[in-house]
Regions:
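Small-residue (G/A/S/T)-rich helix-start motifs and N-terminal tracts that mark the onset
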Residues: 1-81, 91, 187-340, 344, ...
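Nucleotide and nucleotide-moiety/phosphate-recognizing core
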Residues: 38-123, 132-154, 333, 357
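Amphipathic alpha-helical segments in well-structured domains
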Residues: 97-98, 137-138, 174, 326, ...
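Small/polar-residue-rich loop-to-helix segments that shape phosphate-bearing ligand pockets
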Residues: 98, 118-125, 307-316
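Short, conserved catalytic or adaptor-binding loops enriched in Gly and charged residues
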Residues: 98-102, 170-171, 191-194, 357-358
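A short, aliphatic-rich alpha-helical micro-motif
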Residues: 114-118, 171, 304-305, 359-360
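Internal gly/pro-rich beta-alpha loop/helix module
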Residues: 118-119, 124-213
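Cytosolic catalytic cores of cyclic-nucleotide second-messenger enzymes
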Residues: 401
């Protein structure tokens, strides 16, 4: 699994590397530039015909850009740089990179015409952008976006909030984003994910802080190795038992799709507790699943004891009967710490309960989309991707997917 960081977490990791590991900011900047240049050069179709423009801001992202321009030029790729902003506002590191670029006579342009170039590199704003992009910066990014050139973003596309993925007025639309050390959360959420294009995470020598936990991760193909192998002498009873509390009248499809997915993902046995109206369709579509339409506590307890994983919600509905079913299983699962996956109407029913957090803990996995998360948090959808609002997983110690 790869860790995904916020701007604050990235700043802390960066600071730890500089202050405690003793690797200076200019060294990290040079490493970032080298990694970006490697990714760009790999994608050049004809180095002799390429014309690359690096658009640099005055912060450290701009310093990365100036170093990129210099290294490309030294590799024999025709490269120019453009400074967006006033030089007197440059950070010390970026001012140092400008001095180095001038020493190596990397050509600078003062009038921007992006259509002259085959590749445009965006190094205007980094992960610390905290205000809307307006005025000349908005015009600049708009001009860059209109160009037909191949577009590369340094660390994150300028104008994308690195925590939420939201567009701050306008954002650079990259074909490739080379991000450093860790993937930023804004490159996972839309529209930031879309604006990032192909996303490459590069190692520049910034690592996790020992004992410091980063709570968000994304899976990679190699993580499939964590799944246990199916032993050749096993049987359906040893490959996992799934109980679905799913499907209300007229909502058979969600129950069917969820149960079929459980079987396809190698569960040995699947049982569906649903309403009587869904029995025949489910038995016809999915004869390998077991169907139960009774709701009494003795049978419920037997099913709960039987299963390894409990899934509540697909097509369940939010009526009184559905609420009763969901709350009974939630309460009993909380007592025995049975693994529970809450999805769809399971989340909607949870959100209307006054004290819903008492039902959840480390045994619970929530799978909300943005609307369901809005109802759980009691916040407007437009504010949900402010990550300070969706950290319900932290105080309650549950898994959020």
């Amino acid at each position: 699994m790869r860790e995904i960081v916020t701007a604050v977490e990235m700043k802390e990791l960066d600071h730890n590397t500089i202050q405690k590991a003793g690797i200076s900011s200019p060294v990290l900047m040079e490493r970032a530039a080298l990694k970006t240049v490697e990714e760009i050069v790999q994608r050049l179709k004809n180095k002799e015909k390429e014309k690359i423009l690096v658009v640099c801001g005055t912060g450290n992202n701009g310093g990365d850009g100036l170093a990129i321009a210099r290294l490309l030029q030294l590799r024999g790729v025709r490269t120019w740089y453009y400074i967006a902003g006033k030089e007197e506002k440059m950070t010390a590191e970026t001012a140092g990179q400008l001095k180095t670029a001038e020493y190596y006579q990397v050509p600078r342009v003062h009038n921007l015409d992006p259509d002259e170039y085959t590749t445009i590199v965006d190094a205007i704003f980094g992960v610390g952008l905290s205000r809307p992009v307006e005025g000349k910066y908005a015009e600049l990014i708009s001009t860059m976006n209109r160009a037909s050139a191949y577009k590369v973003a340094v660390d994150i596309p300028s104008g994308i909030d690195s925590d939420t993925g939201f567009e701050k007025g306008i954002a650079f639309r990259a074909d490739l984003t080379v991000t450093f050390a860790f993937r930023k959360r804004g490159l996972c959420f839309y529209p930031g994910r879309m604006y990032g294009g192909e996303i490459v995470v590069t190692d520049i020598g910034i690592y996790s802080i020992p004992g410091k936990k980063i709570c968000m991760h994304h899976l990679e193909r190699e993580d499939l190795k964590m799944l246990p192998e199916r032993v050749p002498y096993g049987n359906k009873g040893t490959f996992g038992k799934v109980l679905l509390i799913a499907g209300s009248e007229g909502m058979c499809g969600a129950a069917y799709l969820s149960a079929a997915a459980a079987l396809k993902s190698s569960a040995g046995m699947v049982r569906i507790q649903t309403v009587e109206a869904n029995r025949i369709p489910l038995q016809t579509l999915l004869p390998e699943a077991m169907i139960t339409c009774d709701f009494d506590e003795k049978k419920n307890q037997a099913m709960l004891d039987w299963c390894d994983v409990l899934v509540i919600g697909p097509g369940l509905g939010t009526g009184a009967q559905s609420r009763e079913r969901a709350q009974w299983f939630l309460a009993k699962a909380a007592e025995c710490k049975k693994t529970v996956i809450l999805d769809a109407d399971g989340l909607n029913l949870l959100s209307v309960h006054d004290n819903w957090k008492r039902f959840i803990g480390e045994h619970v996995i929530l799978t909300p989309h943005i609307g369901e998360m809005s109802r759980l948090c009691g916040k407007e959808i437009g504010k949900i991707q402010d990550l300070s609002l969706i950290h319900i997983s932290e105080p309650t110690r549950l898994a959020l997917i």
